[in-house]
Amino acid sequence: MALQLGKKLAQVLGSGAGSPLTPGTMEPCAAGSGSPLANGELFNVSKAKKVELQNLSSRFTAAVTQTPPGVTSSTPNESGVTGPAGPLGATTSSPSLETQSTVIISFKSSQTPVQSQTNSAASENVEDDTAPLPLPPPPPGFGTPTTPLLSSNVLKKVASFTVEKSSAGNNSSNPPNLCPTSDETTLLATPCSSSLTVATLPPEIAVGAAAGGVAGGAGSRRGSSYVPEKLSFAAYEKFEGQMLIKWLISTMQSNPKSSSGDANQELFNTLALQFCNNLKYVGVLKQISNEHLDCGFSPYEMYQWTHTEQPTTSLPLTPGKLDKVAAWPFSSTPSGIRALESASLASLGAGGVAGSLATIATASTASSDNQKTLQQILKKRLLNCTTLAEVHAVVNELLSSVDEPPRRPSKRCVNLTELLNASEATVYEYNKTGAEGCVKSFTDAETQTESEDCEGTCKCGQSSTKVSDNESAKEDGEKPHAVAPPPPPPPPPLHAFVAPPPPPPPPPPPPPPLANYGAPPPPPPPPPGSGSAPPPPPPAPIEGGGGIPPPPPPMSASPSKTTISPAPLPDPAEGNWFHRTNTMRKSAVNPPKPMRPLYWTRIVTSAPPAPRPPSVANSTDSTENSGSSPDEPPAANGADAPPTAPPATKEIWTEIEETPLDNIDEFTELFSRQAIAPVSKPKELKVKRAKSIKVLDPERSRNVGIIWRSLHVPSSEIEHAIYHIDTSVVSLEALQHMSNIQATEDELQRIKEAAGGDIPLDHPEQFLLDISLISMASERISCIVFQAEFEESVTLLFRKLETVSQLSQQLIESEDLKLVFSIILTLGNYMNGGNRQRGQADGFNLDILGKLKDVKSKESHTTLLHFIVRTYIAQRRKEGVHPLEIRLPIPEPADVERAAQMDFEEVQQQIFDLNKKFLGCKRTTAKVLAASRPEIMEPFKSKMEEFVEGADKSMAKLHQSLDECRDLFLETMRFYHFSPKACTLTLAQCTPDQFFEYWTNFTNDFKDIWKKEITSLLNELMKKSKQAQIESRRNVSTKVEKSGRISLKERMLMRRSKN
């Protein structure tokens, strides 16, 4: 049964990447004491060792024997199995089991072998195969080992099972009771494991299980071949643990030789659970969640088959160290071919075409022999490799020693050779006359060389032009001597890339041009006595004729069939090497005086072309012909000649010249610019201030200095403002501040003592000293300040009294207000009709005024106050008053609120305080006049006498206004039959806020509703007027249609109505 579980595991994991199961033969053997089954090292995926299927099954069986207690107690042969006689009894199994095949399963992994993850205690304990196997905690990282992975494509990073046959000869040579040893420490399963499995089963299924083991080993593998999609190893799916257990149990139950029963079902469950637990331990299964990783297999967790990931081969973001292969300049031509090219060039230069062909054939044969020798050495090294790591090292060494293939040129940049339309891949030359008849020779078409002129120009890498042998053969059918390049020899050393150029051979006679190329252009004249080709890389061309030109170097005289030779640079005298600026035809004019500018737009005509020297003309003609392509014939002298330059346009500025004038001096005087000499301001010498004496403390000095700097006036003007009571120069606020900061007697004494010395006082001390010198300064300032305060206080008190007086008078005498109250009385009696307590009223108390808005009608937006306002407006409309002329019948809400805030007792106290201050000011004025000298007495005396006279009248008027306002307020309360809430108070004791509190809300609500009603009435009248106009226009149009005659006025009205 355990064997069957192992086969199912091979089937599941083999579905992803593995070989099919193949039967084999085996020899019986007993498991030694050194078996690694105890610590599970043999079955770890990261160890990459081979495991026999029987060994795997015996491990599962041994683990099951100690798991289910119910089954163990019912097994009578348990003591024999677990005792010392277990191995002896195992050797006496049925001889039919000896024919059972031994299947070796190996965990294939791409990882390098790691060190053993088991502890030393586990390796010292010697256990029997049949002893209970406890499950140690899984070693750290057994599912995802951290060993560095190889980056070769030869190794595959998958965990799979590979089934192999064990050799029958090796197994038969071992004694029956001894375990064979192999290089890979493979343990062969013996019939002992099968007998142990039978011994652990219940008696009723022991025979069937033994027979099933024989049949399963010798015959064909039975069982269901169906694997669920999520359990497939190649599907990379996540599945629940119970799904795997159910599938394993179903495969065991599907076996026709397995008996059914409750005990058997429990054994199946235990065996499948232990089987999955071992799979998790060895690393085949990987738990997804990180919780309970140290526990065993759980059917309620999510699992996944362990797959090792493919190593990433992403290139580094920053360039690393360049190796020899990527050394600059890059060349994809093997050194063997370069040697052949050099040999062919030398032979062509010395002995002609025939000698070069013989040299190329000899070199090609030597290169082929060298390549075969290298291939034989490589085969021997590969055969001597015993592990995949060694094979991988050999392959890497081979790959690193071979040049990389030619890179594809980038589309974003072009080589300089392509821009110049020249290359060294194919070397040939046209004769200018075409008279000689020689066969044109080509170099090897597949020789890829670097363009020397492209170095440092194209940054995306060097590229070469690759031409196949077939294309070369089509282009030149007369080349029987062209030899194909031999296979590439081993990579040359680094010094081969920078070999010195060979000595140039004498140039051969130029061959005639091919028929399909037309007339070739004449080549540029080479320097005398020069060689034939630039130094390699690339190698020198076969044909001569071109020399090494001086810098800037032109291209070789033998361009490719798809390029042309570049023209040499023009003569520097022509100005084509550098951009020639447009020079002026006229010389600069320097007037004797600076003139006024004339802002015009200058036109500069080009200078006439200078005649060209004959030598320059000849060289230019030769360069023009040399720049053509070898595929194109030279331009003819007739119709193919380039068109001449168009004649210059005729302009007035090229025909006229400046006229000499006789009155240029007069012009200079008239239009010269007058230069104004800058006048420098005289520098004011700042007198450094001497040290000053500070008497005050720093805080006091700072406060006095702030007030002094805010005045911005000298002390003399301050003195004048105080003597003349002039607040236009010094503000009243500044005078108040000066009155507050006056020096005390102590400070003033210290300041006077410091002022007698040579060192001046500081500004704050000097300011206090100047104020103290003013006669009666503080008394004068107090009188001036009180004069301003008195006028302000009297004005405020008069306004309060006038507000209450005017409001009381309006409430008594307003006819509009009386109409409103009559409407309220009428509607109230109508609403209270039939009620003996509230009906038939002659008046109402003022507390109802604030409740009118709360009386709702059937319409939610209409209240009793709304109806009262509409009724008042309708009454005024009946009298013929226009809606815009209807006045608000009630007092202004703002006046009512101000009147409610006034208190007669408070006003009377304010008048009393003001009168007291006024009396003090009188005494101060008399004191100042008594202490002042006659010259400083005026105008202070006259102004203060005038103020005192006016203040006496104002105080008497205030007392009178207060009494009149109080009497009028009492009359108003009696007029409206007002009674205070507190019955103990009389009308004389009532305050304005108690009376006007009923009017405040009423006036605010009445005014808001009155504004809305007036606006609504005006809109309604506007609609009616527009409707009337429309009706009148319609009537006019009907009358015109009836009469048949339309006047001009009627036409205008019709047009307006239509618009």
UniProtKB/Swiss-Prot annotation:
FH2 domain: residues covered: 585-1032
Intracellular or extracellular location(s): Cytoplasm, Cytoskeleton; Cytoplasm, Cytosol; Membrane; Cytoplasmic vesicle membrane
Gene3D superfamilies in the cross-refs: Formin, FH2 domain
Composition bias, Pro residues: 133-142, 483-541
SMART domains: FH2
An annotated GO BP: protein transport
InterPro entries, per the entry: FH2_Formin, FH2_Formin_sf, Formin_Cappuccino_subfam
Biased composition (Basic and acidic residues): 468-481
Keywords per UniProt: Actin-binding, Cytoplasm, Cytoplasmic vesicle, Cytoskeleton, Developmental protein, Membrane, Protein transport, Stress response, Transport
UniProt xrefs under SUPFAM superfamilies: Formin homology 2 domain (FH2 domain)
Region (Disordered): 62-146, 448-647
A matching Pfam family: FH2
Membrane-related topology note: Peripheral membrane protein
Renumbered residue ranges of the record's region Important for interaction with spir: 1049-1059
PROSITE patterns in alphabetical order: FH2
Annotated effect of mutating R1055 to A/D: Abolishes interaction with spir
Domain FH1 positions: 480-560
Consequence when changing R1051 to A/D: Abolishes interaction with spir
GO terms for MF: actin binding; microtubule binding
Subunit structure: Interacts with wash. Interacts with spir.
Protein role: Acts as an actin nucleation factor and promotes assembly of actin filaments together with spir. May play a role in intracellular vesicle transport along actin fibers, providing a novel link between actin cytoskeleton dynamics and intracellular transport.
Family, as annotated: Belongs to the formin homology family. Cappuccino subfamily.
Official protein name in the record: Protein cappuccino
Organism: Drosophila melanogaster
